[in-house]
């Protein structure tokens, strides 16, 4: 839907001197999500308390299945793990952000890849899966992570909107951690 996340990922990769590979994954045919369809609007709220726990219109069908299918790329590059920043605590209603999803997909990699059947499967690592947003912010700050390069907003403007579910959960996490968010937001957030 927008290139802002790709720009952010590139900056984070450069910060860590990591290889940055862009894989084209056109999901625009998935018309039921506000993140892939130009016909649906990303919901806007005034506070994180308005974010519902049911499956929202921003759910992209099988998105993490598609992302984790890139285990083949990891295997072909000689890697042994895929790190994914999924989070289930401040749950946004996404079924593919739950521990049982990642456990099931790990079983798929164990039996469905060459390295898996040879006893050394690509491991799915979910380091922040059980952490609150505030815990994530505190850990990232402690580790010196380049939070100024991270992007959570579902919209692709120059500044984060501050009103989509993702922005509100991020802002809540920074507020609860007592740390200023280095990302710029539209208006007076």
Residue positions per predicted region:
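Local cysteine-cluster metal-coordination motifs and their immediate loop/turn environment
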Residues: 65, 69, 73, 151-172
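Hydrophobic residues in alpha-helical segments
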Residues: 128, 174-175
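Short amphipathic alpha-helical interaction/hinge segments
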Residues: 113, 175-178
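ATP-dependent adenylation/nucleotidyltransferase module used to activate substrates
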Residues: 1-143
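Mid-to-C-terminal catalytic subdomains of enzymes
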Residues: 84-91, 146-162
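Short cysteine/histidine-rich metal-coordination sites, predominantly Zn2+-binding motifs
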Residues: 156-157, 177-189
């Amino acid at each position: 839907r927008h290139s802002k996340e790709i720009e952010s990922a590139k900056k984070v990769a450069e910060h860590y001197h990591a290889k940055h590979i862009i894989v084209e994954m056109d999901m625009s045919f998935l018309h039921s999500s506000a993140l892939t369809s130009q016909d649906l609007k990303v919901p806007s709220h005034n506070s994180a308390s308005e974010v519902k726990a049911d499956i929202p219109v921003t759910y992209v069908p099988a998105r993490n299945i598609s992302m984790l299918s890139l285990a083949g790329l990891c295997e072909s590059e000689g890697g042994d793990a895929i790190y994914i920043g999924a989070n289930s605590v401040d749950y946004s209603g996404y079924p593919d952000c739950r521990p049982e999803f990642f456990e099931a997909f790990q079983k798929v990699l164990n039996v469905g890849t060459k390295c898996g059947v040879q006893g050394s499967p690509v491991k799915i690592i979910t380091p922040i899966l059980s952490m609150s947003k505030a815990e994530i912010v505190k850990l990232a700050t402690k580790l010196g992570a380049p939070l100024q390069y991270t992007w959570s907003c579902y919209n692709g403007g120059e500044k984060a909107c501050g009103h989509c579910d993702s922005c509100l959960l991020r802002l809540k996490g920074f507020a609860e951690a007592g740390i200023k968010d280095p990302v710029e937001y539209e208006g007076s957030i």
